[in-house]
């Protein structure tokens, strides 16, 4: 691929730029709401969190694709994975629709369906790095959002910072969930190259049940409590109170007040 073609392949799509703009609009509305819980506050935080989460999904998948591209899988550019266009993902419902549903129901940042990358020719270490690239993006976003909240929080604009804290919380839920060594998740994909071939073959069929595990994690009280306990612990390391994220969750999921 020519240098010009490479630049075209990594150029952000208009849809991704639109999602960034929508996130900014939601943030502006939340800023204007100040510290008052009013319809503008609900609308602003809802738009900011949903659009912001879609942006993070794009960046997560871009992390996988760009790392694979750097290690020699140039087909990811042909498939459009480097454009940050959500339409290029393997399955729109699993990549976008299901994560939105999980946020609506339980405030969990569910990872989307993974992009298809070719790693068979890579070294074991590089295959692991490709798998960890997506969760690394979630970690970086969480740190950025929490640092901004810690340093810039202003009670007069508490609505905005509650939304930012909740968006950071979602990044941490995605990080913890993704790093679990469960077939079908990034954590297992990072370990898989280090397993014996017969072990890989034996566990391969379990990958199709990754969604079932996510549902069990969501519905089983013990597993759910353990999962959120880890997330809250990581969140509190930032020095930002998780109560702020809880307030953001209520604003973003405003229907939970009545249902």
Curated annotation (Swiss-Prot):
One term under GO cellular component: plasma membrane
Keyword Transmembrane helix: yes
Note on cofactor: Binds 1 zinc ion per subunit.
Protein keywords: Cell membrane, Hydrolase, Membrane, Metal-binding, Metalloprotease, Protease, Transmembrane, Transmembrane helix, Zinc
Main location, first listed in the record: membrane
Residues holding Zn(2+): 60, 64
Compartment(s) where it occurs, according to its Swiss-Prot or TrEMBL record: Cell membrane
Cofactor(s) for this UniProt protein: Zn(2+)
Effect of deleting the gene: Not essential. No effect on processing of anti-sigma factors RsdA, RskA, RslA or RsmA.
Topology in the lipid bilayer: Multi-pass membrane protein
Segments passing through the bilayer: 14-34, 39-59, 97-117, 128-148, 156-176, 215-235
GO terms of biological process kind: proteolysis
Domain of life: Bacteria
Active site residues per record: 61
Keyword Protease: yes
GO molecular function, one term: metallopeptidase activity
Family named by the database record: Belongs to the peptidase M50B family.
Protein name per the record: Putative zinc metalloprotease Rip2
Taxonomic source organism: Mycobacterium tuberculosis (strain ATCC 35801 / TMC 107 / Erdman)
Gene expressing this chain: rip2
């Amino acid at each position: 691929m020519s240098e010009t073609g490479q630049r075209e392949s990594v150029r952000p799509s208009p849809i991704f730029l639109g999602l960034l703009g929508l996130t900014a609009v939601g943030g502006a509305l939340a800023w204007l709401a100040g510290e008052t819980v009013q319809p503008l506050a609900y609308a602003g935080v809802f738009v900011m969190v949903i659009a912001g989460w879609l942006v993070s999904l794009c960046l997560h998948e871009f992390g996988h694709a760009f790392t694979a591209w750097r290690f020699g899988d140039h087909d990811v550019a042909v498939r459009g994975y480097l454009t940050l266009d959500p339409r290029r993902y393997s399955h729109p419902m699993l990549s976008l629709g299901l994560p939105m549903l999980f946020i609506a129901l339980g405030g969990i940042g569910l990872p989307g369906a993974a992009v298809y990358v070719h790693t068979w020719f890579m070294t074991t270490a590089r295959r692991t790095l490709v798998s960890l690239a997506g969760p690394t993006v979630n970690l970086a976003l969480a740190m950025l959002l929490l640092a901004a909240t810690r340093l810039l929080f202003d009670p007069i604009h508490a609505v905005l910072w509650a939304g930012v804290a909740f968006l950071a919380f979602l990044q941490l839920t995605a990080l913890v969930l993704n790093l679990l060594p469960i077939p079908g998740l990034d954590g297992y994909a990072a370990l898989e190259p280090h397993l014996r071939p017969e072990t890989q073959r034996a566990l391969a069929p379990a990958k199709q049940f990754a969604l079932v595990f996510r549902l069990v994690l969501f519905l089983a009280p013990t597993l759910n409590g353990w999962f959120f306990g880890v997330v809250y612990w990581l969140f509190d390391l930032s020095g930002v109170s998780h109560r702020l994220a809880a307030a953001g969750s209520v604003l973003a999921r405003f229907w939970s007040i009545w249902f």
